[in-house]
From Swiss-Prot:
Propeptide: 115-161
Region named A: 86-106
C, as annotated region: 74-85
The protein, known as: Insulin-like growth factor 1, juvenile form
Main location: secreted
Family: Belongs to the insulin family.
Domain of life of the source: Eukaryota
Role summary: The insulin-like growth factors, isolated from plasma, are structurally and functionally related to insulin but have a much higher growth-promoting activity. Acts as a ligand for IGF1R. Binds to the alpha subunit of IGF1R, leading to the activation of the intrinsic tyrosine kinase activity which autophosphorylates tyrosine residues in the beta subunit thus initiatiating a cascade of down-stream signaling events leading to activation of the PI3K-AKT/PKB and the Ras-MAPK pathways. Binds to integrins.
Species the sequence originates in: Cyprinus carpio
Length: 161
């Protein structure tokens, strides 16, 4: 075997070994990264909701119906269990699902339909002041109070001096 062929073969073996080591290093790094990130994703299962987050979520889920912090008696499948558990016990101290949140929504009131835009404009418009009819005097409370106090009228109250 010639020395040139030996060095060429040796360098090929070294190169292959180096590539394998680099490949192993990359693979090991990738595996370590995945393992480092995996526990965070496994632990991040269902969340707990407390305080303002719980209220905001209930408002979103229940909408215009409103919600209760404790279930009304006889409401929902857990009415047979103890009645002292509320939404905080069920969703703040442990995780809860959407179904559990919906159990705390107030029931839909029958016959209550959203107002139409036309009705809203009509009922929400500012009231105009009524004009007194001819021959009637329209005095404000301030004017009446000033008249009564100038006459010495105390409104039925007796004052001693």
């Amino acid at each position: 075997m010639s020395s040139g062929h030996f060095f060429q073969g040796h360098w090929c073996d070294v190169f292959k070994c180096t590539m394998r080591c680099l490949s192993c290093t990359h693979t090991l790094s990738l595996v370590l990264c995945v393992l480092a990130l995996t526990p965070a994703t496994l632990e991040a299962g269902p969340e707990t909701l407390c305080g303002a987050e719980l209220v905001d979520t209930l408002q979103f889920v229940c909408g215009d119906r409103g919600f209760y912090f404790s279930k009304p008696t006889g409401y929902g499948p857990s009415s047979r269990r103890s009645h002292n558990r509320g939404i905080v016990d069920e969703c703040c101290f442990q995780s809860c699902e959407l179904r559990r949140l919906e159990m705390y929504c107030a029931p839909v009131k029958p016959g209550k339909t959203p107002r139409s835009v036309r009705a809203q404009r009509h009922t929400d418009s500012p009231r105009t002041a009524k004009k007194p009819l001819p021959g009637q005097s329209h005095s404000s409370y301030k004017e009446v109070h000033q008249k009564n106090s100038s006459r010495g009228n105390t409104g039925g109250r007796n004052y001693r001096i």
